[in-house]
């Protein structure tokens, strides 16, 4: 079994080392193609305005000056002599939940793997950001191997990937695994305006107080309850339930 690893935090990220250890409990045929630098928040973007620079790091490990999407394409189209059986993207530092999956480079790595016809999973470790606070990587490292093996035996339809989020707690405090849907989360984004040394303004995006819908069955509720969240995601973003509604409205109107 061949596994391809990528992430959005970069080739030197601790979460990628965790993912390598997870993958090696499943197979010895592990390949890594990860961004040269942090690509967090770039979602499913391609690099089209500059060249992709590929750097061998060590045996079966490569750094690419590009996005997670670029990394998966480079691995499948250039580096590997055959497609991997599984793409794992992560382990991200911080959860990728609810609306956040649309921004996530970690989830995008799994999206691209799915587009390439490969079983793909995104893995993220929840973490409350604070100086000096440890990331509980051991939660993902302990629970992911068995979970991945189980999910590999599931006959998923084409165009479906799996988003895994591990709770921010001690290993022995994990309250189980729950199959979830995407929740709703407001990140409280605002614009932080500053002034440089020449008096010109510049800006940062700032995260504020997060407000979420913690209804039972959602990914954000599962993590709040110290459960591992397993969310199947589809590439087909068509809102099938609304198609007939729009079609009826158009038939009543003047659209040709």
UniProtKB/Swiss-Prot annotation:
Its EC number is 3.1.3.5. It catalyses: a ribonucleoside 5'-phosphate + H2O = a ribonucleoside + phosphate. Coiled coil: none annotated. Its cofactor is a divalent metal cation. A divalent metal cation binds at residues 8-9, 40, 92. GO terms for molecular function: 3'-nucleotidase activity; 5'-nucleotidase activity; exopolyphosphatase activity; metal ion binding; nucleotide binding. It is found in: Cytoplasm. InterPro entries: SurE, SurE-like_Pase/nucleotidase, SurE-like_sf. It holds the Pfam family SurE. GO terms for cellular component: cytoplasm. Binds 1 divalent metal cation per subunit. Keywords: Cytoplasm, Hydrolase, Metal-binding, Nucleotide-binding. The keyword Metal-binding applies. Nucleotidase that shows phosphatase activity on nucleoside 5'-monophosphates. Belongs to the SurE nucleotidase family. This is 5'-nucleotidase SurE. It comes from Sinorhizobium medicae (strain WSM419). The gene is surE.
